[in-house]
């Protein structure tokens, strides 16, 4: 049963009737009373009078016994321990809690008091008799008459720990109260039968997200929506248009026009700077509390439409809104002005009432009877009807208005001055609100409002407010009255929008209708009236908030900066912040450096400790790190992958690499430096044994060996210095060094002879394998110096023997030749006979100069006794070749030399089929020596015998006179003129033999005279150690390419049985490499020679077995045109050597003046220039056509293949005449009387335009083809051969005059694209199928899109090239954009450094290395596992 009256209305009546507490409860039987009306109202509404419960539990009298502990806590406070409760001490002592009387009672003193229910209410009498405390969120009431026993925290904690106080935190007296009985809710569960959870519906792959449009996008859209007024107006307009017979206008058209009118007016106002509202005042205060201060939780908000300034708490805004914020008046009634029902003034913060009216918030706060239904949002305003009528009848003494609104009175009891709240604010009356606590209850807060008239303003308030005197106050009141009257009378400023006519015309173009102008005038008038009715507020809600401040910002932006001071303050703030951040960054950097130094210190300390524990391991670690640093390509870093090279374990039995050495070092398997050095030597030996000499791995092994030697020496010295090297290890001497030293002492002790010279040459080759580079260089220089001295002593002996011998019939000519230039200080002439250098000098005291010259790298081997001095079967060099692959010789070359040497030893037992070319060469060697020494062969033989050249005498005596011929050659590389014999041919008739004999004597005499008349000068060699890039050829031919296979040894030259063994000197048993030559790091271009096999064929005039030759170079003669028979075309003899600084010694030996063509006697003489730039234009013309053509008649010969003496003399004379005009020391040009053309002397590094990408492959293939063909007979079709030679001559003449050779597929070239430097590339055939493998290297097939680009350049000849870049780019390029790669080393170096950008140069170098790697792969015929090009 509830109350039979309204509790709220009763409380309001009590408030008006009774002003002083206490307020008693009107319910019969309830004697409770309260100090406040709110307490009474709460009691009436919450308390259940039908089931009354005691709000405070009944206190147990102190005279009763305390309850047992099992029953709960004591209900009364225990007395102090000095006054124990009777009968209680013994029980507690028995339980072991003797101090419970004090501790328990004292502890319960707090908990034994009455814990009040926060929701319970107390009567007024009970409230007066108790004191309430808030402990941990609980209200505790203590009687004012009860004693307060105390207990310490430690004692209370000990009692709780022992269990003397149970549930110390729970309220003990009210634990059985109904409100304290909290039961856990019991869930009611019912299982639904046959219920299945369905799968989630399929969701789209993307989320739906709303993206707000920008202002520019919104300006282009239609945002206006018609309302009821617009619909009614449009309906009326359409009715009129129908009466006139016009079409109706749609709603969309009206929305478009209204939207454009609104936006154009907004744009015009913004452009003109017209303010559309009140400007924001930075010093604005809250219009409710008149305070300008704000806090983080109570900031001042400004309305975006009317610029109203209010606090959050004053206006009821619990949180700061994001974006636009409008007050309630602007939000709900933007166009219609509102009036306050509580005062006559307009403006300010409005809120709606519960009846739909408007009132000021400040009025609702100050009038006592008015309330807010929601105290958080302060709306709506209610209880206005409870205002007494007397308030409505009061007259405001400020505005003198009566009956307009409700007034409040002065707080002074004796003053009856009344005033409106807003009028008091305008007049500046003293009005204050304070929150105070209730005097009896600390938990309740009250708001006290004090409003005074100007006459009763408190004195302290006057000082704070600086209130003037009475007269000034009256004057201020009058001004406030006038201001309020002006506000009430003035109408709001309505901004009438205007749009220029041109803009109206633009808007009119957007629509199409009948009588457009009339309709536009009517709709503009309608829009203007609607804006005026809305007090100028824009019809678009978005423009309502933008229009107010936009014009102000635009105007300020035109005039200048909006706030320079604020910007300056912000700038200073950010500068200070940046400085602070910079200081923090520097501090962090210092910390980082400190920690870095700490880490470095710890590492150094660790190294010191490890060095003290195991110093040898530290030294070996340092050495191994240095070795790994030398391995820049990381070739030796990891073990060899046997899956890539399956045959590696067949050749290398003990693999070794730096990674394995590192692992062994970590496992402490190295007890000495020698063990590590042995493993390193094993690694290098494995590399040299398995890889070919022309591979990058072989060169890396050589480079690694040379760079590691000083490292081992340095580490050994450091270990010796530190005393870590054992005594037995300190004096370690290489066994090869000991052998070289011992053999050198023995050779120097023996008398000088040619045999000793040959052994010294062998010893110099043996010194190449010494490990110490410094010792190796020093020892090689010493041996070469001894060789030079010994040669000079032998030459002096020969010279004395020649002058003491009997002169022959040409002695006078020789004396003229030797004595032609008596005025010169020094004349050096070298007579080249089968590669032998013979010096004739008039100064005997030049030995020191010559020794220095030889020691600087004169690697030319003396070859004048190669045919006389033979290597015995057990050569000392054999000990050097005991390893599987000695230094300088790869496995293939070593096997080749061994097989050829064995074949040479077996040759005497087989029927000799040596071609005529070899016998002629032997006879030429003997004849050359006899001619160069004196004109008589008998005298030369005697002189040679006296000098120890017995073999020369033997060969000379065994050569028949029919094999004699002559030739004039010049050795430019040796620095002096020399006379050498040409290649003869054996005749089949006696007439030919006689003619050849007579021709020999005549030509030798002419040769002597020509050599005496021409000036001889030794040119300076600019690059002494530079490797001569020109091809070294030999005048000898392979037995399998002999032009006359029918001629046998019995017909040409009888050979003794010991000749094959004697023709294999020691220099052919070992590969002699020159360490001082200039070799590119990227490629060792294989030198070429015309001799197909330098190791087993006879000795040639050019010295094909020199230090620069290799196994690949000896096969150069096999590379040529496939249609030649037994020799090369005469036009291929020309060589453009303009790119090289010096001329090779073999250039002039193969330049011939006579070249007999065919068997009919027609002989064409071609001339080749040995100089690079010294020939004149006349000489060039002579070179461009054969000599027979210049003489305009064919040259007749007496016998088959044998020219007449007259013809030969004429050729020699012509050659001598041309040679005089040249500045370079071209003594003479060689002539050949053979029926077979001499071998082709290549032009520099020019490669033959063959599909093969490597000259080594060409050489080997050509040699195989030649071997398969055998001794093919010569063709007699002279006309066809002459035509082929003419075409070849024309082609090579074009090459010699600067034209490029023909480009063929599978050639390495330099390619040029626009915007890129010259780049290495490979020419490929567009028809290359997929999976094509060339010499074991897979080549890619061109893509279809690349082939489709061919149609873009149909007007010219282009080549498909594949660049060696990272992406393997394809391109079609013409011939003028391509240069052959690998022909000229200077050209290659120029292309490598052509680009100015370091990154491009690095990329070009990398591509160049890839191209060379590809070349080495296709040249690798032993299957070393080449990788695909892509």
Swiss-Prot record:
Q: Name one GO biological process term.
A: regulation of transcription by RNA polymerase II
- Quote the subcellular location field of this record: Nucleus
**Compositional bias annotation for Basic residues:** 62-81, 796-805
**Residue ranges, compositional bias (Polar residues):** 865-887, 1151-1165, 1265-1278
Acidic residues bias locations: 842-857, 1108-1120
| Segments of skewed composition (Basic and acidic residues) | 1121-1137, 1281-1293
Q: Which residues bind Zn(2+) 2?
A: 303, 306, 327, 330
- Residue ranges annotated for the Bromo domain, each copy included: 611-715
Q: Where are the zinc fingers (C2HC pre-PHD-type)?
A: 337-370
Gene Ontology terms: cellular component: MOZ/MORF histone acetyltransferase complex; nucleus
Residue ranges of every copy of the PWWP domain listed in the record: 1305-1378
Q: Where are the zinc fingers (PHD-type)?
A: 283-333, 394-457
Renumbered to this chain, the Low complexity biased-composition regions fall at: 922-942, 1034-1043, 1085-1107
Extract the GO molecular function terms from the UniProt entry: acetyltransferase activator activity; zinc ion binding
Name the InterPro entries for this protein.
Bromodomain (IPR001487), Bromodomain-like_sf (IPR036427), Enhancer_polycomb-like_N (IPR019542), EPHD (IPR034732), Histone_Mod_Regulator (IPR050701), PWWP_dom (IPR000313), Zinc_finger_PHD-type_CS (IPR019786), Znf_C2H2_type (IPR013087)
Region of interest (Disordered), ranges: 51-111, 796-887, 901-942, 1012-1054, 1076-1301
Annotated Zn(2+) 1 binding lies at 286, 289, 311, 314
Q: Which SMART domains match?
A: BROMO, PHD, PWWP
Point out which parts of the chain are C2H2-type zinc fingers, as ranges. 23-49
The record's listing under Pfam families reads: Bromodomain, EPL1, PHD_2, PWWP, zf-HC5HC2H_2
Question: What are the record keywords, sorted?
Answer: Bromodomain, Metal-binding, Nucleus, Repeat, Zinc, Zinc-finger
Annotated function:
Scaffold subunit of the histone acetyltransferase (HAT) Enok complex which has histone H3 acetyltransferase activity. As part of the Enok complex, associates with the Elg1 RFC-like complex and down-regulates its PCNA-unloading function to promote the G1/S transition. May also play a role in maintaining the protein levels and stability of enok.
Q: Quaternary structure per UniProt? A: Component of the Enok complex composed of at least Br140, enok, Eaf6 and Ing5. As part of the Enok complex, interacts with elg1 and the Elg1 RFC-like complex.
In Swiss-Prot or TrEMBL terms, this protein is called: Bromodomain-containing protein homolog
Q: Which organism is it from?
A: Drosophila melanogaster (Fruit fly)
Upper classification of the source organism reads: Eukaryota, Metazoa, Ecdysozoa, Arthropoda, Hexapoda
